[in-house]
């Protein structure tokens, strides 16, 4: 009698874990979650479509600008910014599938479910890991104030780090790649992560811990440490570049605290409950579901804001973007005198040299 009990809600079709996948035992009371499901059906498609449009436009422009610049050498930060834009672009590509699945169910089969789920998970974790890489690059360039030639991170090493980040992200996405499938739920087909019954609770818990520690806690710690050290350095520095660099750091920290930290904490608490096999009351379970939904939506907004926070704030990127929009740009062949043609002189054609300074573009 009444409404049929519904599954535990998590963000999107691919993030979080289905109640059947991570079941730690029945709730102490029969729990009806029709109100949570109704909120999810309205909230998830709206956020997914908004982030998809903004993320595709912003990150697509970042990629186009970086590629159009045609530089033979790039700074480590530029390499990681390019990879961050790629990860966020791939993530944005999966969101229309999430919106459609939330509205009308999943009708693309289990193979597509696994592919889209894996792409979502890999790109989501890669984006967070590349944010940590950029934070470390900025610390080396600004806080330690080393010239480009003396920094431990070089473009070639940055490429190796990028390969490692993508491999780690694929590893973290293995559960989604292997165990996602479509199945009936509440009268509709759903793309969900469902572990086989043969897997023990320990294996499921280990998978969750690996994702939380490697995909969230580690980059979270790196970013927090680097930005704290950067803030201390910039507060003690003098000169006209200090205020601008400090504003950038403050903007990044505020965006991180508002958009990323709540979801990371909610996921940590949810994983702790999973490992402790705690039973929740119905009201507590609903609050947890709503927290994961809302904070998960906030962290997706991050991928559409990254181009503004990490690329558009850079002077070099804005110069490259201006040349791209004006249809200009350097010839791939260097000018014999090392100067720009007269018609492009005002576009600041030559790439700025990395120097010993507080500039955020280093």
Curated annotation (Swiss-Prot):
Protein keywords: Cell membrane, Disulfide bond, G-protein coupled receptor, Membrane, Receptor, Transducer, Transmembrane, Transmembrane helix
SUPFAM superfamilies documented for this protein: Family A G protein-coupled receptor-like
PROSITE patterns hit by this protein: G_PROTEIN_RECEP_F1_1 (PS00237), G_PROTEIN_RECEP_F1_2 (PS50262)
GO BP terms: chemotaxis; immune response; positive regulation of cytosolic calcium ion concentration
InterPro entries according to UniProt: CCR1-9-like (IPR050119), Chemokine_CCR10 (IPR005382), GPCR_Rhodpsn (IPR000276), GPCR_Rhodpsn_7TM (IPR017452)
The organism's place on the tree of life at top rank: Eukaryota
Keyword Transmembrane: yes
Membrane disposition: Multi-pass membrane protein
Tissue specificity comment: Expressed at high levels in small intestine, colon, lymph nodes, Peyer patches and at lower levels in thymus, lung and spleen.
Residues on Cytoplasmic side: 70-80, 137-159, 230-247, 313-362
Extracellular side: 1-48, 102-115, 181-208, 269-291
Transmembrane segments: 49-69, 81-101, 116-136, 160-180, 209-229, 248-268, 292-312
Gene Ontology cellular-component annotations: cell surface; endoplasmic reticulum; plasma membrane
One example GO MF annotation: chemokine receptor activity
Sequence similarity: Belongs to the G-protein coupled receptor 1 family.
Name under which the protein is recorded: C-C chemokine receptor type 10
